[in-house]
């Protein structure tokens, strides 16, 4: 685990950068929109919530900020968001997939009607929506000489079990899977992919449990704290002469950032380093050989081709 501390000097690297953010009207997304905009970025954000989005526009003024009504579960809607940003500015440099939902009602409740199909909104928004965002982001970032950055939004539930929230847990594990599945390919194309995993954050999601949580003295993030980690991910590779944020190891890609009590910690590198302990040394050694085999240029999953 490595503590990450923002280097304010790197914020200047955001000046004139074009940033696309999903779920930018409220909560963490709104804080991310604000932080990027305050540091000179041109921000195009999407959301289904029109009224809060208009409030964001009013608070930040009319320059370098645009809202595009967008439903993350719709591929066509996300395409429109990105196409609008590219049409406005001619490029896209940074993408933050922040849109997310949570349903506190358990689909495994013994009192639930088994004949009623359960809602999969969390899967559709959090996982499939993030896949859509990442896919379209790759298309546009490939057009840049220096690639770009994709920042995904998971949760502590993306790597830690929590009772009752099964679809939400599944969806956020899926977002971590997007990072792990994409970052190696993206790195070859100069594109960095990272994922932020906050613990309890003061947003609409925790209204029902906030009082008891705080009374017990448990840590709470503010949405601005999580937005700061998004910005760290988006700027860690943009410093001159190898300069980066305190604790960041370059190249900063394929990282998982745990956010607790307002502070960010990179945990993916340590997870990988400890693999021989939790998987077993021999298993880890054989797995590494298999991964090397699958990384060969001639390797293919296509059943009609031979690797």
Please describe what each predicted stretch is.
Residues 6-44:
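Canonical Rossmann dinucleotide-binding motif of NAD(H)/NADP(H)-dependent dehydrogenases/reductases
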Residues 39, 160, 181-191, 200, ...:
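Active-site-adjacent segment of SDR/Rossmann-fold oxidoreductases
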Residues 39-55:
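Conserved glycine-rich Rossmann-like NAD(P)H-binding loop of the short-chain dehydrogenase/reductase
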Residues 102-120, 164-167:
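Conserved mid-core segment of classical short-chain dehydrogenase/reductases
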Residues 134, 171:
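Active-site helix of classical SDR
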Residues 155:
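Residue(s) in the substrate-gating loop at a strand-loop-helix junction
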Residues 195, 215-306:
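C-terminal helical subdomain
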């Amino acid at each position: 685990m490595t503590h990450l501390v923002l280097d304010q000097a790197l914020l200047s690297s955001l000046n004139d950068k074009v940033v696309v953010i999903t779920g930018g009207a409220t909560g963490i997304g709104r804080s991310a929109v604000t932080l990027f905009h305050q540091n000179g970025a041109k921000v195009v954000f999407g959301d289904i919530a029109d009224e809060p989005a208009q409030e964001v526009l009013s608070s930040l003024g009319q320059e370098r900020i645009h809202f595009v009504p967008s439903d993350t579960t719709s591929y066509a809607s996300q395409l429109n968001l990105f196409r609008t940003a590219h049409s406005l500015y001619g490029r896209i440099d940074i993408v933050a997939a922040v849109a997310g939902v949570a349903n506190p009602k358990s689909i495994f409740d013994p009192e639930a009607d088994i004949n009623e199909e359960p809602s999969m909104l969390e899967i559709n928004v959090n996982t499939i929506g993030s896949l859509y965002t990442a896919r379209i982001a790759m298309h546009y970032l490939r057009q840049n000489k220096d690639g770009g950055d994709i920042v995904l939004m998971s949760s502590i539930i993306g790597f830690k079990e929590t009772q009752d929230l099964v679809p939400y847990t599944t969806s956020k594990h899926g977002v971590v899977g997007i990072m792990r599945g994409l970052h190696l390919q993206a790195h070859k194309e100069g594109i960095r992919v990272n994922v932020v995993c906050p613990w309890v954050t003061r947003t609409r999601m925790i209204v029902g449990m906030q009082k008891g949580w705080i009374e017990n003295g448990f840590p709470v993030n503010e949405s601005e704290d999580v937005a700061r980690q998004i910005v760290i991910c988006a700027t860690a590779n943009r410093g001159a002469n190898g300069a980066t944020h305190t604790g960041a190891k370059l190249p900063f890609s394929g990282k998982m950032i745990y956010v607790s009590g307002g502070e960010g910690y990179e945990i993916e590198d340590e997870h990988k380093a400890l693999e021989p302990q939790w998987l077993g040394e021999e298993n880890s050694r054989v797995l590494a050989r298999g991964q090397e085999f699958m990384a060969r240029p001639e390797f293919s999953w296509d059943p009609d081709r031979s690797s």
